[in-house]
Design a protein with these regions (language model features):
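Compositionally biased intrinsically disordered regions enriched in Thr/Gly
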Residues: 1-217
């Protein structure tokens, strides 16, 4: 098996840059740790490669793999400019894409977003970004996914049932990211739709939200 994990490195100096780089380093370390644990559970050996965002090799730990062992691989990539979903003088949002394969027809993609305050280096949660009560967010996001389902019929459930499922699950801990036009809420494959649908998402425009932070765009 094998694991490959990239790490985005922010340029510059100061405590804020150091804090953001520390968060990204912790992400890389968590992926490597999870891969080691999974490979031990599968009783397979693996090679490990880690790289910074410029593609330079940072560490390589090759091991011999037995062809009879279970197939395992994990990758974490941060795709340069395409990984930046929002950027202004004060805030940045970064996407990290991952993929884990443990056998079968296909693996499991995963995705994380990191919203940073560039002045402090702090990673922001949804409650740091918006003031809306959870109940309002549940209504807005549920209705948006229902509208998407009515247009594309992408979900496991009917649009009406999907609206209730989404609304019941939305909280300040829900996965989200910042785009140029609004706050985006998303689900992983298989959560509300088939693997082929990827990461279903809806955008709630900034104009419809009570923002705690002032964005430049």
């Amino acid at each position: 098996g094998s694991v490959y994990a990239e790490r985005l490195v922010f340029d510059g100096e100061g405590d804020a840059v150091e804090a953001m780089n520390q968060t990204m380093q912790e992400l890389q370390a968590s992926v490597l740790s999870a891969a080691r644990t999974d490979s031990m559970n599968l009783d397979t050996e693996m090679s490990i490669d880690t790289a910074e965002s410029d593609g330079s090799e940072e560490e390589t730990l090759p091991q011999e793999a037995d062809a009879a062992q279970p197939v395992y691989s994990m990758a974490l990539t941060i795709d340069g400019d395409d990984a930046i979903t929002y950027l202004d003088d004060h805030y940045v949002c970064v996407r990290a894409d991952g993929y884990e394969y443990t056998g079968g027809a296909h693996g499991t993609p995963f995705r994380q977003y990191f919203v940073f305050d560039r002045e402090t280096g702090a990673r922001l949660s949804l409650s740091d970004v918006v003031e809306n009560p959870v109940e309002e967010l549940q209504t807005k996001v549920g209705a948006a996914f229902r509208e998407l389902a009515e247009k594309t019929n992408f979900a496991f459930e009917s649009p009406e049932d999907l609206e209730h499922t989404v609304a019941d699950g939305i909280s300040y801990e829900s996965p989200f990211y910042l785009s140029e036009t609004g706050v985006v809420f998303y689900y992983a494959p298989y959560e509300i739709a088939s693997y082929a649908e990827g990461f279903p998402e809806v955008t709630i425009p900034y104009s419809e939200l009570e923002m705690r932070i002032e964005l430049s765009k």
